[in-house]
């Protein structure tokens, strides 16, 4: 019996089996690129007003005038980045046909772990090489000075688009390096050329945490993106499915379910498109004729599991210990969490970091969404912030299970 089974298993290499299916099997997806969040469609549905407002705000740059600083708000998946990138793309096409010294610079603040890295990203897109702007080693003030000089000497009209600018504000708060304030005052130091800031934020309350001086300069104009309705998401999905899948491959009920699931999450079109993509990939792997509701439900589970697991595994050791301390403390204050963290360090033989540093890590983990904090009132003792996990403890245990240092305390 075992010999027969072994022979059956070795009849065909498992890699070849998968590649044969990919090469010769059924394919329901004909253009995967259209299901990526980076894809910019020619038509962005239900965002005509927002496109007009952002374009009006940025269009003075084509007349060699400085556009007003702009803040773009809206929850994730409401089309903010898509609209801004489309407009930048169209402006760039016109710039190429002229001799205007215009630079459109885009960066996502969350992709950079330090303020230095963020400023270097701006510099590279302005054309500064490693000699002119080293990847490390300069003071923040010197990096900023070199950015201003590049704009000034090139007589450049520059637009810095900062996606997830709320994360930059968090970095500023953490390092006490007021880069946002310096960026908003940069034009006072630029004799030739100009700098405009476009900030994109998922956090509608973000500006309430800004220094009033920064807010005044940064929000010269504002555009708010409302949530998509379920019907609007359905129309977006129909459009993408028609281009990305072979005709008739996606059932109407599957599209409805994708739209309904995304609609429950504040109208997140990005999640809806991601669901459709993963559901399509699962249908192909199963050699199915098309995408069904079952594929969509399976895709939703897979996306959630992968997202949380990957994020948890990526944390450094001491942030993992802080997360475990929150899990063990169950809704406790920073002081109680720090006490548990110290005990976990003792059990794992790790050097204990200061309470200030541990509290900072707790704030970083909260920002990433793995824990949530809530202010509670405690009578004469005033207010305190209580923290709890936003993911199931079982997910944490699974993600940290391969870490040999943590194995004995999970």
Swiss-Prot record:
Keywords: ATP-binding, DNA replication, Nucleotide-binding. One of its GO terms (molecular function) is ATP binding. One of its GO terms (biological process) is DNA replication. It comes from the Archaea. CDD domains: AAA (cd00009), Cdc6_C (cd08768), HLD_clamp_RarA (cd18139). The keyword Transcription regulation does not apply. ATP binds at residues 78-82, 228, 240. Involved in regulation of DNA replication. PANTHER family: CELL DIVISION CONTROL PROTEIN 6 HOMOLOG, CELL DIVISION CONTROL PROTEIN 6-RELATED. Belongs to the CDC6/cdc18 family. This is ORC1-type DNA replication protein. It comes from Cenarchaeum symbiosum (strain A).
């Amino acid at each position: 019996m075992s010999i027969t089974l072994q022979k059956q298993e070795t009849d065909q290499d498992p890699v070849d089996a998968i590649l044969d299916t990919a090469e010769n099997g059924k394919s329901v997806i004909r253009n995967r690129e259209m299901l990526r969040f980076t894809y910019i469609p020619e038509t962005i549905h239900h965002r005509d007003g927002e496109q007009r407002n952002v374009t009006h705000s940025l269009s003075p740059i084509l007349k060699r005038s400085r556009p007003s600083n702009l803040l773009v708000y809206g929850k994730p998946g409401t089309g903010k980045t898509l609209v801004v990138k489309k407009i930048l793309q169209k402006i760039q096409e016109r710039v190429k046909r002229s001799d205007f010294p215009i630079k459109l610079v885009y960066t996502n603040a969350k992709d950079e772990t330090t303020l230095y890295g963020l400023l270097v990203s701006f510099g590279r897109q302005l054309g500064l090489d490693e000699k002119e702007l080293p990847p490390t080693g300069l003071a923040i003030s010197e990096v900023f000075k070199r950015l201003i000089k590049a704009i000034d000497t090139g007589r450049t009209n520059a637009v810095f688009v900062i996606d997830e600018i709320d994360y930059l504000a968090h970095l500023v708060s953490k390092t006490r390096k007021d880069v946002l304030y310096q960026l908003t005052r940069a034009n006072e130091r630029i004799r030739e050329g100009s700098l405009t800031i476009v900030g994109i934020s998922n956090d509608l309350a973000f500006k309430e945490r800004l220094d009033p001086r920064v807010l005044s300069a940064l929000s010269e104009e504002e555009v708010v993106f409302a949530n998509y309705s379920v019907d609007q998401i359905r129309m977006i999905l129909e459009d993408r499915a028609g281009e990305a899948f072979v005709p008739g491959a996606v059932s109407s009920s599957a599209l409805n379910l994708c739209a309904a699931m995304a609609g429950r999450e504040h109208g997140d079109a990005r999640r809806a498109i991601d669901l459709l993509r993963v559901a399509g990939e699962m249908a192909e792997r199963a050699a199915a004729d098309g995408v069904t509701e079952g594929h969509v439900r399976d895709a939703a589970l897979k996306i959630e599991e992968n997202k949380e697991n990957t994020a948890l595994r990526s944390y450094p050791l001491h942030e993992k210990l802080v997360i475990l301390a929150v899990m063990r403390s169950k809704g406790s204050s920073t002081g109680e969490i720090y006490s548990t963290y110290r005990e976990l360090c003792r059990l794992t033989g790790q050097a204990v970091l200061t309470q200030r540093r541990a509290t900072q890590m707790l704030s970083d983990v909260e920002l990433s969404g793995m824990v949530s904090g809530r202010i509670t009132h405690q009578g004469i003792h005033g207010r305190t912030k209580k923290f709890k996990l936003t993911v199931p403890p079982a997910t944490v245990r699974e993600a940290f299970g391969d870490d040999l240092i943590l194995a004995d305390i999970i």
